[in-house]
């Protein structure tokens, strides 16, 4: 779908320049070069390349913890009496309220709901959300990353993707913050691979 949209730009009345998106660890060209000639695109192997490229979750040329994948260890059921803070929530300021009202008026028939709106809207708030996740959820995220509870819609998940998508945070600072937050012995035994998605 994206490629079709880009192809249509060739016929635009103005000259269009596509700029690289620095919100990702890999460029389109890097991914295409990796994917070329492969019968199946198993992302696990691409993630390994990204680890080698960045040095994240690596000890020299070997994966931290001695293996590439800890998925089997990350499938524990969450205890029923677990207490979870959840993601950091923010009260919308006057400007955000004004935008929410405008969206409701102009796009009220679109799918989804505007309320409750508790997301960060500034870089400072997004950094607070990252710090909150690192301090309160990351230590237990790995064990329970696939767990679900009726009482907790997010459990230990970060809910940082919106801030990546709109450029309030960048992927490198998030990965480095997570890697640096864990004690060295924890990093070796169960690094936060699932949180990194590689």
Protein language model annotation of sequence segments:
Residues 2-118:
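Beta-rich, aromatic/charged-enriched effector core domains that present basic-aromatic interfaces
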Residues 73-198:
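Catalytic cores of enzymes that engage adenine nucleotides and/or redox cofactors via long glycine-rich
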């Amino acid at each position: 779908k994206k490629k079709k949209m880009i192809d249509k730009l060739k016929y635009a009345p103005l000259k269009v320049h596509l700029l690289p998106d620095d919100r990702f660890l890999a460029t389109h060209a890097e991914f295409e070069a990796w994917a070329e000639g492969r019968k199946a695109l198993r992302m696990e192997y691409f993630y390994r390349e990204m680890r080698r490229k960045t040095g994240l979750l690596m000890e020299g040329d070997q994966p931290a913890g001695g293996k590439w994948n800890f998925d089997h260890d990350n499938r524990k059921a969450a205890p029923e009496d677990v207490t979870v803070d959840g993601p950091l929530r923010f009260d919308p300021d006057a400007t955000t309220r004004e935008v929410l009202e405008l969206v409701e008026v102009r796009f009220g028939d679109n799918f989804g709901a505007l309320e409750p709106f508790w997301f960060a809207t500034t870089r400072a708030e997004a950094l607070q959300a990252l710090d909150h996740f690192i301090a309160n959820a990351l230590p237990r995220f790995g064990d329970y990353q696939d767990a679900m509870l009726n009482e907790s819609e997010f459990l230990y998940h970060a809910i940082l993707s919106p801030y990546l998508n709109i450029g309030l945070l960048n992927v490198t600072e998030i990965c480095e913050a997570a890697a640096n937050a864990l004690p060295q012995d924890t990093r070796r035994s169960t690094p936060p691979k699932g949180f990194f998605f590689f």
